[in-house]
């Protein structure tokens, strides 16, 4: 299953993404987070210590994390500020900590948290003046932390459904 977290105020990007993924046999779930009540991670580590796999913050993110447990791919659709994710995108990704375990292991020569569930592939679709290189490196590191691989980073403007590149379609469907 592929989860698309759309943090933008508009649903239009979700419609574009849905049409790009329509010819794949993957189940796609698009979640619009802009109107959801999602708080910032407070770094309490309760998701590791007191309530393993569950965030201590009782808000709308609980629905999202339950669906991420069953997903193989995560696409984050976000605006950018100062070349990076805006606060909505960053907030949604910071809350993914319950997917990990507090114990550390070496993977590919790097120290990483053990996975609580399974690997999750991560991709970013951004709007605005994002720093492509920075976002690509961030996506790769997030995916590595989650045991998966980067699905790529694409500007929303490059997803014109009338002429999407084969590469974008292939990455989104993987």
Would you name each region that the model predicts?
Residues 1-5, 73-75, 118-125, 149-153:
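Hydrophobic beta-strand segments of well-ordered beta-sheets in folded domains
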Residues 1-78, 82-101, 161-174:
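N-terminal beta1-alpha1-beta2 submodule of the flavodoxin-like/Rossmannoid cofactor-binding fold
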Residues 5-10, 126-130, 155-158:
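Structural motif
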Residues 30-34, 103-108, 149-161:
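A generic structural motif
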Residues 102-149:
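Short, glycine-/small-residue-rich phosphate/pyrophosphate-handling segment
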Residues 131-174:
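Glycine-rich phosphate/pyrophosphate-binding loop and the adjoining helix
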């Amino acid at each position: 299953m592929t989860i698309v977290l759309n943090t933008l105020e508009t649903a239009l990007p979700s419609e574009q993404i849905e049409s790009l993924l329509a010819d794949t046999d993957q189940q796609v779930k698009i979640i619009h987070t802009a109107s959801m009540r999602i708080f910032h991670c407070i770094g309490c580590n309760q998701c590791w210590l007191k309530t393993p796999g569950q965030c201590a913050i009782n808000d709308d993110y609980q629905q999202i994390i339950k669906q991420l447990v069953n997903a193989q791919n995560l696409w984050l659709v976000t605006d950018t500020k100062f070349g990076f994710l805006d606060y909505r995108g960053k907030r949604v990704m910071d809350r993914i900590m319950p997917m990990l375990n507090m114990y550390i292991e070496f993977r590919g020569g790097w120290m990483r948290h053990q996975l609580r569930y399974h690997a999750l592939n991560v991709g970013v679709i951004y709007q605005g003046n994002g720093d492509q290189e920075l976002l690509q490196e961030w996506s790769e590191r997030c995916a590595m932390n989650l045991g998966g691989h980067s699905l790529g980073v694409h500007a929303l403007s490059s997803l014109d459904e009338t002429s999407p590149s084969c590469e974008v379609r292939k990455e989104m469907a993987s």
